[in-house]
Structure formats: structure tokens, C-alpha cells
Amino acid sequence: MTHKISVLHQDKKFDFSLRPKKLTEFCGQKQLKERLDLFLRAAVQRNEVPGHCLFYGPPGLGKTSLAHIMANTIGKGLVIASGPQLLKPSDLIGLLTGLQEGDIFFIDEIHRMGKAAEEYLYPAMEDFKVDITLDSGPGARSVRLDLAPFTLVGATTRAGMLSEPLRTRFAFTGRVDYYTDEDLVSILSRSSQLLAIEANQETLLEIARRARGTPRLANNLLRWVRDFAQMREGNCINSAVAEKALAMLLIDNLGLNEIDIKLLSVMIDFYQGGPVGMKTLAMAVGEDVRTLEDMYEPFLILKGLVQRTARGRVATPLAYEHLNRNPKDRWGEE
């Protein structure tokens, strides 16, 4: 079945317009949502500021959206900062003293905060107080300032890099996991309505199963399919058009992209399936180690294509099968 796309004249607020505003609009993550809903409603019922929250998991799964939802739920403001920009106490002072009572202070990539800034945050989290130094030299003096009670929400893709003193100061900790194809179809259905795109379930499923379990990527692919249909297919969209559009991005039916395929090919063709060190793989595909570990390896492991061992990464029989390679020599199959 073929559908028409209504061309939007303004799409500058694409990501913001698709962001869910309430937990009921947030698809997937059922257990996390249930816990967070209880946590927030209990605080509101007691007329208290909710405790500090930490969300962790791979990028693009909705950690920032949860911070927005929290602010909407309790009816307060949202102040956003990024960990790499918070290196020293002076980077935090203006943000902390500017908070209003009940505000959500969201720090993305909180694991990348500077150590000095992190330690400066401790009394702010525990007692809602900070010390500032006035003047300099022998006449310098420290003054303690009271802060308005606030909720710190941290987001990280690397929870293991958080120090224990910081991690234990969060009252609520939740992992955001990869989404099922069914959840992604629900997300895409909502997004297509907001973007005035008519697409059936078959088309949305074609996009969802190539989105690596990630809503952000799913929405980006939906926008790409819309653009492709607009420019190449007379604004008509169906599953065949979606398949052609996604093939142009070199994304296969499992959601693997060019880098994923290159990683598996290097492991199989040059290192007999492994084990191979991540530094070696990074040099072979022209990416840095951190990018591979954060953006590519988790999905390959999730799909059962790669195993992590003490000696390095190993391509599994599924990887051989997906790349149409013969696993006989490596795995002893007949």
C-alpha cells in the first residue's frame, strides 16, 4: 500500500516536537517508567522536591527525554548542562545559584565532569549549600551560600566511570535499555503523526528493525525516508520505498551499517574471527577506541555477532552467517 507524505514547511524543531512530554507518551521501558512514576508522584504528594536521579545506558535511548518529562510532571523548570563543560567549581557556581526551588538540573555525560567540579557538587546535592571564595590572596575568605532545593538528574553512557561518592548520592538509578522493534513501531507511529507522514505498520517495521533498538536513530531514519520519498518517489511512501531509502544509507536488514560490517569483516577475514584487541580494530576501521566501544560494540554484542573475551573480541557463528562467510575453519563445522 502506498501513502502520500505531506511536506512540512518547517521542521526546525524536529527533535523537540517528537520528544514525549509525559510518561504515558514515553514508549517502552515499562519497569523503569513504573518506578519513576511512583518516585515522582510520591514526592509530589508529600510536597517535596524529588531526590536526585541517574539514568544510564547507550546513547539515544531517551535519558534526556526523561529529564524533560520529570520537569513537566512536577511543573518546574529544566536547566541543562553538559559534563565536559563542567571542569572546575566556577563552571558550576552560576548554574547552581541560578536554580529556582524544585528545578531539574540535568547534566548530560555526567561521567565527563572534572574531578574538582564533581567534588564541589557533593554539598550541593546533600545539603543544598555551596562555598564560594571572595577576593584572593591573604585576604581571601569563604562564604557558604544556601541553594534552592533542586533535583539533579545525571545521564551517562558509562555508569562504571562514575566515582562511588557521586553514584551513591543518587536516590533513584535507572538503566535505559535498547527498545524492541514493537516499541520502536509505536514510537514511529507517534512521530509520523506529528510529522504528517502517512505510513502503514509494515513500512514502520521496516524502519524499526534497522534502527538498532534506538528511538533517536529510528526518528532520524523516518525523516530520511520522508526526504527520500519526497525527492525520488513523488512523495509516496511504502515498505519498498523505505527499503530503498535505507539501502542508500548502507544499512542492512539487521540494522548494521558500514562500520559494523567493516568491523566484522576485519575480524573474520584478517584475524580468523579473533580474538582481536579493540585498538587493532580501531586502527583497521579508522575509528577511535571509545567510539567503537560506545557506538558499535554494544549493538553487535546484543545481536550475538561479537563476544568479548579476556583476550579480545571474537566474531560468532552468527557473524559468519550474516556476512555469508564459511565458518568451517574457525568453528569446526561440517
UniProtKB/Swiss-Prot annotation:
GO terms for cellular component: cytoplasm; Holliday junction resolvase complex. Residues 180-250 are annotated as: Small ATPAse domain (RuvB-S). Its EC number is 3.6.4.-. Residues 1-179 are annotated as: Large ATPase domain (RuvB-L). Keywords: ATP-binding, Cytoplasm, DNA damage, DNA recombination, DNA repair, DNA-binding, Hydrolase, Nucleotide-binding. ATP binds at residues 18-19, 60, 63-65, 126-128, 169, 179, 216. It is found in: Cytoplasm. It catalyses: ATP + H2O = ADP + phosphate + H(+). Mg(2+) binds at residue 64. DNA binds at residues 308, 313. GO terms for biological process: DNA recombination; DNA repair. Residues 253-334 are annotated as: Head domain (RuvB-H). GO terms for molecular function: ATP binding; ATP hydrolysis activity; four-way junction DNA binding; four-way junction helicase activity. It is an enzyme of class 3 (hydrolase). Has 3 domains, the large (RuvB-L) and small ATPase (RuvB-S) domains and the C-terminal head (RuvB-H) domain. The head domain binds DNA, while the ATPase domains jointly bind ATP, ADP or are empty depending on the state of the subunit in the translocation cycle. During a single DNA translocation step the structure of each domain remains the same, but their relative positions change. PANTHER family: HOLLIDAY JUNCTION BRANCH MIGRATION COMPLEX SUBUNIT RUVB (PTHR42848:SF1), PTHR42848. Belongs to the RuvB family. The RuvA-RuvB-RuvC complex processes Holliday junction (HJ) DNA during genetic recombination and DNA repair, while the RuvA-RuvB complex plays an important role in the rescue of blocked DNA replication forks via replication fork reversal (RFR). RuvA specifically binds to HJ cruciform DNA, conferring on it an open structure. The RuvB hexamer acts as an ATP-dependent pump, pulling dsDNA into and through the RuvAB complex. RuvB forms 2 homohexamers on either side of HJ DNA bound by 1 or 2 RuvA tetramers; 4 subunits per hexamer contact DNA at a time. Homohexamer. Forms an RuvA(8)-RuvB(12)-Holliday junction (HJ) complex. HJ DNA is sandwiched between 2 RuvA tetramers; dsDNA enters through RuvA and exits via RuvB. An RuvB hexamer assembles on each DNA strand where it exits the tetramer. Each RuvB hexamer is contacted by two RuvA subunits (via domain III) on 2 adjacent RuvB subunits; this complex drives branch migration. In the full resolvosome a probable DNA-RuvA(4)-RuvB(12)-RuvC(2) complex forms which resolves the HJ. This is Holliday junction branch migration complex subunit RuvB. It comes from Chlamydia trachomatis serovar D (strain ATCC VR-885 / DSM 19411 / UW-3/Cx).
